C-alpha cells in the first residue's frame, strides 16, 4: 500500500516571541500561511515487516532518525503498535534550512499519509498534537492553511483565506541553524510588534493593511548574524514589492505583490543576485 502527500512550504506573515518557557522553548505568536512551493512525499507501508527507510533526491538531508519524516513514522508506529515497514520517498522542492518549514511539512505529510494507510481515523487535531512531539511547526503543517499560531506551536487557530497575492521567495546561498538563532535571542532587547493590527486586516481581507502590518522580530537577530538577509529584503522592496520580510529564522526572504507583472519583474531583477528565486501563490 502506498500514498503520496503534498507537503507545502510555510511562510511567516507575522512572527514574534515574547519570552522563553522554563524548558527553554520559545513562546510563539505567529501568523503562518502555506504556498504552492511543495515537496511530494510518497509513503509505502509493507505489513508484517518492521523498520523505516527514508530516501530523498538531495544529499543535504539525513535519511536516519534525524529526519523529521522518519520521526513522524516512528512515533505513529510506536503509539499505535503498527507492525509494518515504512518506506518514505521525499521529492524535495523546498530549499533546506531556509525558514520555510520543509522538514516539518514532510513530517506532517507522513502523519497524514500513514493515518490513511493504517486506517487510524485520527482527526487533524490529534495528528497536530502528535506533531508537536516532532517540531513546533508540525502542528501548523498538518493543517497547512492560514492560521494564528500560539504557545509552543500547539495552538493553531484558523483564519480567513488571504486576499489574492503573488509571492516572490528568495533564498541566499547560506543556511541558518534555527537552534543557533533562537539561542541568540534577547527578548527584552527586541522591538516587538502588535499582532492585533494584522489579524484585523486579515479579517477585513484588506491587502494593503496586511502588507503594512507584516513583521518578523527575528530579522533583528538573523540580520545581525547574516547582513545579506537584510540586503535581499531591501532589494525586493526596491524592485516593487508591496511588503518584504524574512520567513522563520531565515535566511529566506519573501516579497508580496498584488499584480503578477510586478512579481515577475521582481523575480527577473533578483536573478543573478540571489541563489534561488521562486514565484508562488498562497494556498
Curated annotation (Swiss-Prot):
EC numbers for this chain: 2.7.1.148
One GO BP: terpenoid biosynthetic process
Molecular function per GO: 4-(cytidine 5'-diphospho)-2-C-methyl-D-erythritol kinase activity; ATP binding
UniProt-listed InterPro entries: GHMP_kinase_C_dom, GHMP_kinase_C_sf, GHMP_kinase_N_dom, IspE, Ribosomal_Su5_D2-typ_SF, Ribsml_uS5_D2-typ_fold_subgr
Pfam families membership: GHMP_kinases_C, GHMP_kinases_N
Origin: domain of life: Bacteria
Active-site annotation: 10, 137
Key word Nucleotide-binding present: yes
Transmembrane portions of the chain: none
Catalytic activity: 4-CDP-2-C-methyl-D-erythritol + ATP = 4-CDP-2-C-methyl-D-erythritol 2-phosphate + ADP + H(+)
Residues binding ATP: 95-105
Alphabetically ordered keywords of this record: ATP-binding, Isoprene biosynthesis, Kinase, Nucleotide-binding, Transferase
Pathway the protein acts in: Isoprenoid biosynthesis; isopentenyl diphosphate biosynthesis via DXP pathway; isopentenyl diphosphate from 1-deoxy-D-xylulose 5-phosphate: step 3/6
Role played: Catalyzes the phosphorylation of the position 2 hydroxy group of 4-diphosphocytidyl-2C-methyl-D-erythritol.
PANTHER family, sorted: 4-DIPHOSPHOCYTIDYL-2-C-METHYL-D-ERYTHRITOL KINASE, CHLOROPLASTIC (PTHR43527:SF2)
Family of this protein: Belongs to the GHMP kinase family. IspE subfamily.
Name the record gives this protein: 4-diphosphocytidyl-2-C-methyl-D-erythritol kinase
UniProt lineage: Bacteria, Bacillati, Bacillota, Bacilli, Lactobacillales
Amino acid at each position: 500500500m502506498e500514498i503520496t502527500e503534498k507537503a507545502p512550504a510555510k511562510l511567516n506573515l507575522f512572527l514574534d516571541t515574547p519570552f522563553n518557557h522554563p524548558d527553554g522553548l520559545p513562546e510563539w505568536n505567529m501568523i503562518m500561511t502555506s504556498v504552492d512551493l511543495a515537496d511530494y512525499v510518497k509513503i509505502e507501508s509493507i505489513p508484517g515487516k518492521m523498520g523505516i527507510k527514508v530516501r530523498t533526491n538531495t544529499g543535504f538531508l539525513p535519511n536516519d532518525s534525524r529526519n523529521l519524516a522518519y520521526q513522524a513514522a516512528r512515533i505513529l508506529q510506536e503509539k499505535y503498535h503498527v507492525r509494518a515497514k515504512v518506506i518514505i520517498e521525499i521529492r524535495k522542492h523546498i530549499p533546506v534550512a531556509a525558514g520555510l518549514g520543509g522538514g516539518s511539512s514532510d513530517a506532517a505529510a507522513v502523519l497524514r499519509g500513514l493515518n490513511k494507510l493504517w486506517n487510524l481515523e485520527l482527526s487533524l487535531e490529534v495528528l497536530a498534537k502528535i506533531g508537536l512531539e516532532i517540531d513546533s511547526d508540525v502542528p501548523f503543517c498538518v493543517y497547512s492553511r492560514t492560521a494564528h499560531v500560539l504557545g509552543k506551536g500547539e495552538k493553531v487557530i484558523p483564519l480567513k483565506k488571504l486576499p489574492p497575492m503573488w509571492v516572490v521567495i528568495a533564498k541566499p546561498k547560506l543556511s541558518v541553524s534555527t537552534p543557533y538563532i533562537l539561542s541568540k535571542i534577547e527578548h527584552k532587547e527586541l522591538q516587538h510588534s502588535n499582532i492585533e493590527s494584522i489579524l484585523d486586516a486579515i479579517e477585513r481581507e484588506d491587502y494593503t493593511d496586511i502588507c503594512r502590518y507584516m513583521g518578523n522580530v527575528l530579522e533583528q537577530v538573523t540580520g545581525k548574524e547574516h547582513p545579506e538577509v537584510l540586503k535581499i529584503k531591501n532589494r525586493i522592496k526596491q524592485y516593487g514589492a508591496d511588503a518584504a520580510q524574512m520567513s522563520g529564522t531565515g535566511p529566506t526572504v519573501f516579497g508580496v505583490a498584488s499584480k503578477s507583472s510586478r512579481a515577475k519583474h521582481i523575480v527577473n531583477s533578483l536573478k543573478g543576485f540571489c541563489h534561488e528565486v521562486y514565484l508562488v501563490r498562497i494556498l
